[in-house]
Amino acid sequence: MKEEEVILVNEPIGLMPKLEAHQKAVLHRAFSVFILNDKNEIMLQQRAHQKYHFPLLWTNTCCSHQRSGETNIEAGSRRLFEEMGFKTELKELFHFIYQAPFDNGLTEHELDHVMIGYFNENPTINPEEVEAWKWM
């Protein structure tokens, strides 16, 4: 299985394996998806226990990295379905850059594109990616 790569930025300048980018704190593209229901509750997920990066952390509905050639919306839709098992229309709201080093030697340094969508049903989570979920 080929190792997942991330897109280095600000203009795309190349690809790098995801783990290496997090080890070297190289700026790369990412996205965060927030799903709301009709009660204006947000769907949160708890990352699966076997994830190398922040296992069991409660986080937004889903977040990941764009693949080469994917738009932000395509990437968000792909990963939302892979992790949470549903599709819904997404809208990109804004983007920002952040850097956050962690105790495990990895650093998030991302140009993060934030998207929102709406869904009122229960997701069908992928246990390889998601431990649990809840509306909050």
Model-derived regions: residue spans:
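Acidic, metal-coordinating catalytic segment for phosphate/diphosphate chemistry
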Residues: 1-32, 36-39
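A short, polar/proline- and glycine-enriched secondary-structure boundary/capping micro-motif
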Residues: 24-26, 53-58, 134-136
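A glycine-rich, hydrophobic loop/mini-helix early in the fold
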Residues: 32-62
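The catalytic Nudix box helix
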Residues: 44, 59-93
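Active-site segment of metal-dependent pyrophosphate-handling enzymes
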Residues: 83-123
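NUDIX/MutT-family hydrolases
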Residues: 114, 126-136
